[in-house]
Amino acid sequence: LKGVFNCTQLVIPHMLNASYGSIVNASSVVGLYGNFGQTNYAACKAGLIALTKTWARELGPKGIRVNTICPGFIATDMVKAIPDDVLKTLEERTWMKRLGEVEEVAKVYAFLASEESSYVNGSVIEVSGGISL
């Protein structure tokens, strides 16, 4: 949380000068729902959601949008290191029956950073294949 807070504090003055900006934070479905054995990770990612919503309220009137993305289990090196039996269970828990691809998450980041999302502020977007349904 400290790193996100410090970096955001550095860029906000520039965005305020422009009366425009988009901040897109990286949380996780674990920040929304928790996960066994991941107390510290869940707390950090939940904290990012709270920061996002607070900054959206504070900065939105000044032309700066703040949103966060909560990926589920995405085919990254970190997730691929999970034991195969656990990984198979995770895939079965999603309604898409597979891991997400990095590109699928990247497209959501690109959308939120663009003018195409000019009225999206304070949103928490889950990109998880429906794992929480």
Question: Model-predicted segments: where are they?
Answer:
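A short helix-coil junction within the Rossmann-fold of NAD(P)-dependent oxidoreductases
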Residues: 10-22
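Active-site helix of classical SDR
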Residues: 8, 44, 52
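C-terminal helical subdomain
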Residues: 5, 68, 91-116, 120, ...
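Alpha-helical segment proximal to the catalytic Tyr-Lys
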Residues: 13, 57-61, 118
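Residue(s) in the substrate-gating loop at a strand-loop-helix junction
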Residues: 28
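Short, flexible catalytic-loop segment of classical short-chain dehydrogenase/reductase
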Residues: 49, 70-81
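Active-site loop-to-helix junction immediately N-terminal to the catalytic Tyr of the SDR YXXXK motif
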Residues: 34-42, 54
